[in-house]
Amino acid sequence: MITGTMHSRAHRGWIGAALLAAALTPWSAQAQGHGQTQTQSQAQAQTPMQTPSLALELAKSGLRLLDGQGRVQAELPMRAKRWDHRQLPDGRTVALVQDADSGVLRLIEARQGHLEERRRWDGPAFNVEALCLYLPPAQPLLQAFVLGDDGIGEQWLVDERSPSGAGHAPMMRRLSSVPDARGCAVVDTENRLYVAEAGVGLWAQSADAERHERHLVAPGLAPADLPLWLAARGSGRADALPVVQPSGQTVPVRGSGDAADDPAIWVHPRTPTASRILGTDKKLGLAVYDLQGRETQFLPVGRVNNVDLRQGLRYGGARWDLAVASQRDRKTVVVFQISANGQLTTAAELPTGLDDVYGICSGRNPAGGLDIFVNDKDGRVQQIRLQRDGKTWTGQPVAQFRLDTQPEGCVVDEVGQQLFIGEEKRGLWRLALEADGRMGAAQLVLPVGDVLTADVEGMAVHRSAKGAWLVVSAQGSDSFVVLAAQPPFAVKGRFRVGLNAALGIDAVSETDGLDVTAANLGGVYGEGLLVVQDGHKRWPLGRQNFKLVPWAEVMRVMP
């Protein structure tokens, strides 16, 4: 076990944000979460601590590794001002130290009585006033917060497995921090970053790069009192859901801001690896991507919100692959024909009679044609039967019902003869599809609560010989719920989509739409593919996109 100390007369009056481990308890996985800065008062705060077997010490001459009797086992000469350290899940201890002369950040490992530099990165363009590390419990990839003056800050991925180019660590996000930061601390178990602002107090914000909130938790708290405040309040534990890694991502959508929304997967009938992903850009149109995430086609059909498709539909003795999208400007449903090689053409535009067209899904009806379920923000859900007269596609209204508040995501489970639809603030509903294709009464399957957090967004059914699972996006907690697609609709588990450091893919947050297929698309997608919209493109910072997740990974983390 290794703990950290520091000795210096250079910077008095502030107890660095990271003495949870040093001043309160011996260093352990349970006490991780504290940024460190050179101060004399920090060294004095070491007195109540139990003697560990090894300790890291930042002295004037450099970083030292001490044994239990305080004898120097190893020393790495340097002048340093900011540092922090963590014990990794494999038992190793690493420290991130900023060289006071060059500004370079050095990742140092304490190993077998030695100190060894593992990685180094150029410092940021601004002057660093506070530095602290973060090791997320659910996906322990080492990250660093570097905070400067005037409210400037950045969050970096400094894990050994992360790619780095031209001497720079991958930046996960820019931070709007406090204007006069005097130190920072991260309580890993809470996924919470604390920043001390001189003359104001202590601010707290999410350490998760995908979240944004910040609030003042201790007005007037002096920076020197931060360790005592943290000790008095105790340490909570965030909801640590299992994490799956994305294996791919699409290029960013063309529209800026909140533009990407809903995907749909088209499976190539002969070459599954040549399958396509349709994705709505709700500002400009519909994009088509291959499984490598490259855009193969773009249809400038305006503000289409959601999209769905079905393959092998029967009309006039022929088979058709068709996609439908909700068009908000014209309050219509746009119908697309899909060719055998995955090319889309606009085939028709159907009126709905709705005032604010929003979500859409579709399913094969008993005659082998397509039924479309399109909803309005006022709660109305309309069922339209797609018909073909000669070479013309038309829509025939079949039924309509209404939820109390705004719906959006929905999915038709043809095998189960049922429609699932999400009411954003209330929960997940199920309606039986009758033999004549009409809808039965609505049944609340899973209300909004601790498991399914609002807003309820995208949903899709993965059906294979192993069973049928409904996966639903719970936008408020950046999570996904998996439940059985048949009564009693038992919840199997929840998960989040984290980052993939090796491939340079950021994590997923605030998901709108999703789709899933059980088809074998080859490679890691042998058991199917889950595609989810990512509400915040962090790494690198850019426009929204869609992430690809092997379904086998989802099942791997289910209980």
Name these PLM-found stretches.
Residues 2-16:
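Bacterial N-terminal signal peptides that target proteins for export
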Residues 5-7, 20, 55, 222:
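Intrinsically disordered, low-complexity regions enriched in Ser/Pro/Gly/Gln/His and often acidic
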Residues 16-26:
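Bacterial N-terminal signal peptides
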Residues 29-559:
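Sequence/structural signature of beta-propeller domains
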